[in-house]
A protein has these predicted regions:
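Nucleotide/pyrophosphate-binding catalytic subdomain
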Residues: 1-147
Length: 147
């Protein structure tokens, strides 16, 4: 349980973070944890303090699990290697599902949210003689859009 003195200590920092943008990155496995709802409540608290939040999620946990369920080998689960077509299709499926679950959780806390295309990326192409297939490289983040 939080003590009143702890709360006072926290509250003195709030004014310096109002209207700021926090980027929170979470692993996909966390979304399925029973305590994920607490993270969503923390995000709701940040929003109530006029702190903007961008939530970025991974999906490798769900990708591995779906591939195993379907008996389909995957070429790249952690985002660092070559991504083939079948792996890309599975990754898109799990990412869309996960985004939907997160949006539902945010909505249940009266938070409005949207999935964006603020990440500008291009195919990695051929690197050191290796065709990276569907693996991409982030060129930039449209941070003006996120603000």
């Amino acid at each position: 349980m939080i003590k009143l003195t702890d709360l006072r200590e926290i509250l003195r920092y709030v004014p310096s973070f109002r209207e700021k943008l926090f980027v929170i990155s979470i692993d996909g496995e966390i979304v399925e944890d029973e305590h994920f709802a607490n993270i969503l409540l923390d995000i709701a608290l940040l929003r109530s303090l006029n702190i903007r939040v961008v939530l970025v999620h991974g999906a490798s946990y769900q990708l591995r699990r779906l591939a195993e369920e379907m008996g389909q080998p995957i070429s790249n689960a952690d985002g660092t290697g070559i991504t083939d077509g079948p792996t890309l299709r599975l990754a898109l499926t799990v990412s869309n599902r996960l985004s939907h679950e997160i949006l539902e959780g945010l909505a249940s806390n009266d938070l409005r949210a949207a999935c964006t295309n603020a990440v500008v990326a291009h195919p990695a192409g051929i690197l050191r003689g290796v065709d990276m297939q569907f693996t991409g490289r982030v060129e930039r983040i449209d941070d003006a859009f996120l603000r």
